[in-house]
Amino acid sequence: MPVLHNRISNDALKAKMLAESEPRTTISFYKYFHIADPKVTRAALYQLFTALNVFGRVYLAHEGMNAQISVPASNVETFRAQLYAFDPALEGLRLNIALDDDGKSFWVLRMKVRDRIVADGIDDPHFDASNVGEYLQAAEVNAMLDDPDALFIDMRNHYEYEVGHFENALEIPADTFREQLPKAVEMMQAHKDKKIVMYCTGGIRCEKASAWMKHNGFNKVWHIEGGIIEYARKAREQGLPVRFIGKNFVFDERMGERISDEIIAHCHQCGAPCDSHTNCKNDGCHLLFIQCPVCAEKYKGCCSEICCEESALPPEEQRRRRAGRENGNKIFNKSRGRLNTTLGIPEPTE
């Protein structure tokens, strides 16, 4: 029986990937389609991906598939062909190729079965996820940005919006996508006559969000096909102005893709212009925050003097201190709330 999980340590896998000489390509894709038995599908896909030396993160559910992966450059077309042939619903699926990429984004394959491919908290049996808003292409996005009747809604987390977003886009202040959905409806109630344009990194969140807005009585709803990644790629290919400002946060080792030269965020420790995310080097924290090179040296990659001191302790003492304490290894969620308490950043005003 084939092994459907990793047997090598994470550190060893990372070292092996970094030592590879063959270039890799970072790819993301998603598809809402019915999967009768996600566990059976996982077993088959795991073998397919492993045979092509694919690394990354893949989520499967009855509602579809969501993936961010790294593929050896020589295997990309074979991977595409085999993915398209795997299920008729995947034929011709758009694969988002990373914009700013050295391929060293993942070093292990993790494939999980979940209740949903994106956690939305929706339990309304009458909700139709297929009744989505209209797609917008790059040129149409730019036209909408110039339309005074259009409102752009960012369906990403605070730490993503903080380092980059479309011109004048509205942030939905929440720690998770499931919290954003009802807030988006509430915030837009007074703007039902407006054109609502929703966007996210690769399209998966804004597609479902557009269906949720329509379910709640909004009729003028659009979403950007392929999200920020596809928009930026097509705008560059077509010689259009790129109207996304700053950096596009991504959920892999890179933590961001440079879209424009502007740096719109600031170091969370000294306030200097900076949009480089990092995780606190203290294994008992791992807070995701923005840190400039000066503060990285001053605090040795940690988020505070306390973490700096703790990370310098002998490993056994660090483990003793972490025992019974909530581990901060929540890299990609609840960032704003955790920043408020850890770094002393004031709560946002309403």
Curated annotation (Swiss-Prot):
PROSITE patterns in the record: RHODANESE_3
Origin superkingdom: Bacteria
Keyword Oxidoreductase applies: yes
Active site: C200 (cysteine persulfide intermediate)
GO MF annotations, alphabetized: oxidoreductase activity, acting on paired donors, with incorporation or reduction of molecular oxygen
Enzyme's top EC category: oxidoreductase
Keywords from the named record: Oxidoreductase, tRNA processing
Enzyme Commission designation: 1.14.-.-
CDD domains xref list: RHOD_YceA
Short name of one Pfam family: Rhodanese
Reactions it catalyzes: uridine(34) in tRNA + AH2 + O2 = 5-hydroxyuridine(34) in tRNA + A + H2O
Gene3D superfamilies with a match to the protein in the record: 3.30.70.100, Rhodanese-like domain (3.40.250.10)
Domain Rhodanese, first and last residues per copy: 146-240
Transmembrane parts of this sequence: none
An example Gene Ontology biological process: tRNA modification
Family, similarity comment: Belongs to the TrhO family.
PANTHER family: TRNA URIDINE(34) HYDROXYLASE, UPF0176 PROTEIN YCEA
Function: Catalyzes oxygen-dependent 5-hydroxyuridine (ho5U) modification at position 34 in tRNAs.
Protein name: tRNA uridine(34) hydroxylase
Organism: Shigella dysenteriae serotype 1 (strain Sd197)
Phylogenetic lineage: Bacteria, Pseudomonadati, Pseudomonadota, Gammaproteobacteria, Enterobacterales
